[in-house]
Amino acid sequence: INSIYSDINGNLFDPYNGKDDLKKGFVNFIGDPDKRIKEDYLRILRYLRFFLSYSKKSHDKDLIRKLKLNLNGVSKLSKDRLLDELKKLIKAENLEKLSKDKICLELISLIFPELKNINIFSKLNSLKRQIVENSDFIFLISLMVIDDTDNSDYFLYKFNISKKDEKRIKKISNFYKEKGGFKKFNEKDINEIFYYDGKQAVLDILNYKIIKSKKIDNSLIKLSKTYLNKIKPIVPI
């Protein structure tokens, strides 16, 4: 698939019959997989991304064995390249399939052990699925790395996240820990965050709680809808 090209006139160049593979839902490396992986270990993650996006077939056992044998090479890659590829992989349409594919899940967990809660996407009701589909990368990462340990702090230390995005993740994490896993909080807490940190922080916290909750909490859903359309008042100096 990666070897299909088009010129400025729209003429298609497909030297390895990638178009046919795409129709069949067949994902594989060009040539010797072991050699191709060693040329760039990031291709392990690219295989997972392409498999989740295009494959209609099961994994090739021999190929998976070669991927696993080369996993140590991932440590040679820069953190920026790893994060960039993770952003391409962590798409709402991929997450449910990823969380149900044992092989993809195992490989991702070995490469990114900080994504401890990736299984959360395996059982989404319609409301949770809608939230996930409308969420950006940073919120999706928050769902996977935040727990009652310092796991999210380590993820932020390990990868180069912008200060703005780092603040978003920390806000959810701190609120989670301060409120005992969101067991104790009320509208007053949310209002305070709205006025000090803005709408995005409130929606992040509420949507995080909705997705993490085992039961549907109508009060949370109502709050989320309220703050979605709420405008922060401008206080005169």
Predicted regions and their residues:
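Glycine- and charge-enriched loop/helix tracts that form the active or gating conduit
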Residues: 1-157
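C-terminal subdomains that position terminal phosphate/3'-OH groups for nucleotidyl transfer/ligation
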Residues: 105, 111-237
